[in-house]
Amino acid sequence: MDSVHDMGGVDGFGKVEVEKNEPVFHAAWEGRVLAIQRAMAYGRAWNIDQSRFAQEQLPPITYLSATYYQRWLLGMEKSIIERGFATAEELKAGHATTPGKMLPRKLTVSAFQQRRRSFFRQQQAPALFKPGDRVRTRNIHPKTHTRLPGYARGKLGVVERCQGSG
């Protein structure tokens, strides 16, 4: 998707200030947002690319002015409403007014502990390329999420490593 989120190589945003001894979360609610995101993804409400796409659809001014976890929260709210897990009114009120829609799969503590160690996925099909292969990326403009940033489209490169497929 071509939108404001794809800022790789863009000038004019100034120096990135690194916070010394930066905590993982600046506020407790950020940790809860991460936990909800992980539970919803494990529960198959959505996947990581769908989560990113929801954030990429935020209005540019919102995307640029929100913090990292604010974008996650806004994207989750959109996805929760679109998928029928809650209504906008319920989110605003902070509680359900009708019985909720169940997730396809429930996250348990043991399942979380097993999954949190790695995001590695077994390769589902033979790799199309191998390290050392010369490749050219496509110059695409998809309407949904892509992992190919604008600055890398239509460019020549060499495969350095394969990390599986999914």
Each model region followed by its residue ranges:
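N-terminal intrinsically disordered, low-complexity, charge/repeat-rich segments that act as generic
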Residues: M1-G100
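Basic/aromatic-rich interaction segments and small domains that mediate binding to polyanionic partners
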Residues: V10-M40, I80, F119-L128, H141-G166
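Mixed-charge, Lys/Arg-rich low-complexity intrinsically disordered regions
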Residues: K92-H145, A152
